[in-house]
């Protein structure tokens, strides 16, 4: 199959297995959920009644005081006591096979092509690391919410995009399923397309 280059009167021949396969919603969902789960920090920590600081002595005798019975100042009922079901550090990552991950990326890229959300260009760059230059370029292309993928990371482009809302710049090696579906449009250079094809082959 062929992808038309928007900035040139030509087309780029690409593999149908990467850019023309059926959309597997279940697979994409599973991989996106796993990717998001892996990004969770998981460092929350609370103390149980066994871990909080305090004496093990019974605060007052069982009977005769008129007060409610109590066995420990570390009881979860008490102020500064332990937490009943204390949260502990946790690894939320889920296992995803390479074949599944690649399949999900291919499925997303194919769907972007079908929905006309993938724009392929010969090259995409700015002369200097200036936000104004990139903003003007995107305005000319009628793009606002966009992910720009280049073959190698263009430092000028990366720096120019940092202060633009809903604009991100990645190199081909750094793409992930969440970023591909998060933006309204995806702009890829011809080099990036070839690199992604090789990566997912």
Swiss-Prot record:
HAMAP family: Ribosomal_uL4_B. Part of the 50S ribosomal subunit. GO terms for cellular component: ribonucleoprotein complex; ribosome. One of the primary rRNA binding proteins, this protein initially binds near the 5'-end of the 23S rRNA. It is important during the early stages of 50S assembly. It makes multiple contacts with different domains of the 23S rRNA in the assembled 50S subunit and ribosome. Forms part of the polypeptide exit tunnel. GO terms for biological process: translation. Keywords: Ribonucleoprotein, Ribosomal protein, RNA-binding, rRNA-binding. GO terms for molecular function: rRNA binding; structural constituent of ribosome. It comes from the Bacteria. InterPro entries: Ribosomal_uL4, Ribosomal_uL4-like, Ribosomal_uL4_dom_sf. Belongs to the universal ribosomal protein uL4 family. Transmembrane segments: none annotated. It holds the Pfam family Ribosomal_L4. Coiled coil: none annotated. The keyword RNA-binding applies. The keyword rRNA-binding applies. Residues 44-71 are annotated as: Disordered. This is Large ribosomal subunit protein uL4.
């Amino acid at each position: 199959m062929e992808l038309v280059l928007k900035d040139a009167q030509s087309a780029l021949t690409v593999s149908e297995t990467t850019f023309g396969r059926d959309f597997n919603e279940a697979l994409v969902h599973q991989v996106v959920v796993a990717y998001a789960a892996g990004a969770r920090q998981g460092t929350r920590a609370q103390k149980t009644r066994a871990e909080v600081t305090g004496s093990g002595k019974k605060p007052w005798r069982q009977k005769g005081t008129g007060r409610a019975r109590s066995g420990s100042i570390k009881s979860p009922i008490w102020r500064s006591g332990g937490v009943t079901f204390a949260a502990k550090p946790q690894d939320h990552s889920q296992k995803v096979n390479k074949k599944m991950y690649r399949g999900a990326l291919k499925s997303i890229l194919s769907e972007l092509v079908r929905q006309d959300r993938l724009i392929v260009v010969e090259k995409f760059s700015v002369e200097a690391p200036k936000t104004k230059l990139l903003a003007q370029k995107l305005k000319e292309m009628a793009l606002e919410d966009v992910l720009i993928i280049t073959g190698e990371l263009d430092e000028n482009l990366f720096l120019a995009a940092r202060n633009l809302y809903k604009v991100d710049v990645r190199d081909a090696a750094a793409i992930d399923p969440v970023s591909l579906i998060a933006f309204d449009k995806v702009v890829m250079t011809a080099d990036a397309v070839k690199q992604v094809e090789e990566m997912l082959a």
